From Swiss-Prot:
The protein, known as: Bile salt-activated lipase
Active site: 214, 340, 455
Any Gene Ontology biological process: pancreatic juice secretion
Protein function: Catalyzes the hydrolysis of a wide range of substrates including cholesteryl esters, phospholipids, lysophospholipids, di- and tri-acylglycerols, and fatty acid esters of hydroxy fatty acids (FAHFA). Preferentially hydrolyzes FAHFAs with the ester bond further away from the carboxylate. Unsaturated FAHFAs are hydrolyzed more quickly than saturated FAHFAs. Has an essential role in the complete digestion of dietary lipids and their intestinal absorption, along with the absorption of fat-soluble vitamins.
Domain of life of the organism encoding this protein: Eukaryota
CDD domains reported in the protein's UniProt record: Esterase_lipase
Organismal lineage: Eukaryota, Metazoa, Chordata, Craniata, Vertebrata
Cleaved signal peptide residues: 1-20
Tissue: Synthesized primarily in the pancreas and then transported to the intestine.
Length: 612
């Protein structure tokens, strides 16, 4: 065999990620780990070291995670581990396993020497706190959260990891017997492991950025607010979710704990006995006890997201809005997709994506009432009025459907994100604040032509999929991906998305409450992409007009009489506009909040995984 043939075979070996990592065997607190090195071209040069499946913690069912005890010999870190136990998409079975707390690392390497002191980006996945994994969705071994493109294009270390989800990650009795937040504590353990060990991989332990999307973005926000992470995190990026999101904190965990306990045959009157029983129940039974009907639900879908973080007096010691002093020195970048609410609107108002089915005023009014229960009839009416102002001039179905999506986007994503940005800015000491809107239209061919960027549409661009799978994307998609990776990794390096090794298409100015600066990210990013005060009219409505209305329902409990109830919409033209209900049968119900309201009908409506 000739020398050229030998060389070719050797290069092919490395391109298949079968060569030993350039770092060699790396010593961690648990023992030695050895990954693989993947060459980025046949001619050699740059490469990436990849370590998959490194254990960072262990955990028993419904208990806090503990440090992993370590291993003997050298761990071959070459394959992703199974995700944490969760329901399948059909919710009639489970997959994954309880032994799931593993992380993955991508380290870019140059031609001559191994990397050192690189910024570190730690990814937290979304999935409604119900599903997901550190590697993400898989299509022909092409994993969504493969960190290679970010690492090599941005010259940063990328870390992803698993954390517990669903009842196993967030079931809580609301007291010390079962405090919950196990999934958040898993995340913290991964961040702390990175802090202690990443220097051995060439990373800078004093320059860690956590970033995430949806439930992962809310997790990022909550991690910056938790006193447990003091000194661990330098910067944070929240994509479509914050700690102040209406779906990020469960205010009534005991109700849902009792509901699950009843389903699996555990006592419910005493939380200590209930917790003890739940901890020894088959984890698969606990997981499958939570189920969601994805149609014909009585309330907006977010009301059914039961197993999510709680204020436990410890890891999350207070209402998140009171914890922003803890993030005063953490640079923060946050934003939303311009039609983030579309995914949820398709569940709440199924006609949204159906060309031959109309959205009616009644549909929208009922949706609004479900989201404005706390302010009763006046809140529902005021909200309905401001969002439907354009309908008189443009009663087209396109305009009406876009209004529904805009409303869900505002209340679930934009308003809480703007609140979080303002809180961060108000409490920041040395930290900087940046805001964005992602508006590159969805590539889903089944969506209406008016569709913008749906929930999670940004993920493929942040993780460089237009480069990893070029045949599936257009040149404009690669332009968007290149810009997002550049801004994100520059921010991780310096706290400024403009400053770093990667050139950017235009200068991104910091956010303040006075200027309302945000960068509009799409295929054409120019100086005109820097804009101010996103949807200012609606922000003012929610912050001023809506907030000034008297609260008639506290803590999501039902109204006591019809005068306070959220109304149902008109049913014919003679009514002219939405009117309040005239009897109990017309009142829009609110989700149950305590055991007195529990029953078979409630359990039949109980949700499972969707969206966030």
């Amino acid at each position: 065999m000739g020398r050229l043939e030998v060389l070719f075979l050797g290069l092919t070996c490395c391109l298949a990620a079968a060569c030993a990592a350039k770092l060699g065997a790396v010593y961690t607190e648990g023992g030695f780990v050895e990954g693989v090195n993947k060459k980025l071209s046949l001619l050699g040069g740059d490469s990436v070291d990849i370590f998959k499946g490194i254990p960072f913690a262990t955990a028993k069912t419904l208990e806090n995670p503990q440090r992993h005890p370590g291993w003997q010999g050298t761990l071959k870190a070459t394959d992703f581990k199974k995700r944490c136990l969760q329901a399948t998409i059909t919710q009639d079975d489970t997959y994954g396993q309880e032994d799931c707390l593993y992380l993955n690392i991508w380290v870019p390497q140059g031609r001559k020497q191994v990397s050192h002191d690189l910024p570190v980006m730690v990814w937290i996945y979304g999935g409604a706190f119900l599903m997901g994994s550190g590697q993400g969705a898989n299509f022909l071994k092409n994993y969504l959260y493969d960190g290679e493109e970010i690492a090599t294009r941005g010259n940063v270390i990328v870390v992803t990891f698993n954390y517990r989800v669903g009842p196993l990650g967030f079931l809580s009795t609301g007291d010390a017997n079962l405090p919950g937040n196990f999934g958040l504590r898993d995340q913290h353990m991964a961040i702390a492991w990175v802090k202690r060990n990443i220097a051995a991989f060439g990373g800078d332990p004093d320059n860690i950025t956590i970033f995430g999307e949806s439930a992962g973005a809310a997790s990022v926000s909550l991690q910056t607010l938790s006193p447990y992470n003091k000194g661990l995190i330098r910067r944070a990026i929240s994509q479509s979710g914050v700690a102040l999101s209406p779906w990020a904190i469960q205010e009534n965990p005991l109700f849902w704990a009792k509901t699950i306990a009843k389903k699996v045959g555990c006592p419910t009157e005493d939380t200590a006995k209930m917790a003890g029983c739940l901890k020894i129940t088959d984890p698969r039974a606990l997981t499958l006890a939570y189920r969601l009907p994805l149609k014909s639900q009585e309330y907006p879908i977010v009301h059914y997201l039961a197993f999510i973080p709680v204020v436990d007096g410890d890891f999350i010691p207070d209402d998140p809005i009171n914890l922003y002093d803890n993030a005063a020195d953490i640079d923060y970048l946050a934003g939303i997709n311009d039609m983030d609410g579309h995914l949820f609107a398709t569940v709440d108002v199924p006609a949204i994506d159906k060309a031959k089915q109309d959205v009616t005023e009644e549909d929208f009014y009922r949706l609004v009432s479900g989201h404005t229960v706390a302010k009763g009839l006046k809140g529902t009416q005021a909200t309905f009025d401001i969002y439907t102002e354009s309908w008189a001039q443009d009663p087209s179905q396109e305009n009406m459907k876009k209004t529904v999506v805009a409303f869900e986007t505002d209340i679930l994503f934009l308003i809480p994100t703007e609140m979080a940005l303002a809180q961060h800015r108000a409490h920041a000491k040395s930290a900087k604040t940046y805001s964005y809107l992602f508006s590159h239209p969805s590539r889903m061919p089944i969506y209406p032509k008016w569709m913008g960027a749906d929930h999670a549409d940004d993920l493929q661009y942040v993780f460089g999929k237009p480069f990893a799978t070029p045949l599936g994307y257009r040149a404009q998609d690669r332009t968007v991906s290149k810009a997002m990776i550049a801004y994100w990794t520059n921010f991780a390096k310096s706290g400024d998305p403009n400053m770093g090794n990667s050139p950017v298409p235009t200068h991104w100015y910091p956010y303040t409450t006075e200027n309302g600066n945000y960068l509009d990210i799409n295929k054409k990013i120019t100086s005109t992409s820097m804009k101010e005060h996103l949807r200012e009219k609606f922000l003012k409505f929610w912050a001023v007009t809506f907030e000034m209305l008297p609260t008639v329902v506290g803590d999501h409990t039902p109204p006591e009489d019809d005068s306070e109830a959220a109304p149902v919409p008109p049913t014919d033209d003679s009514q002219g506009g939405p009117v309040p209900p005239t009897d109990d049968s017309q009142t829009t119900p609110v989700p149950p909040t305590d055991n007195s309201q529990a029953g078979d009908s409630v359990e039949a409506q109980m949700p499972g995984p969707i969206g966030f």
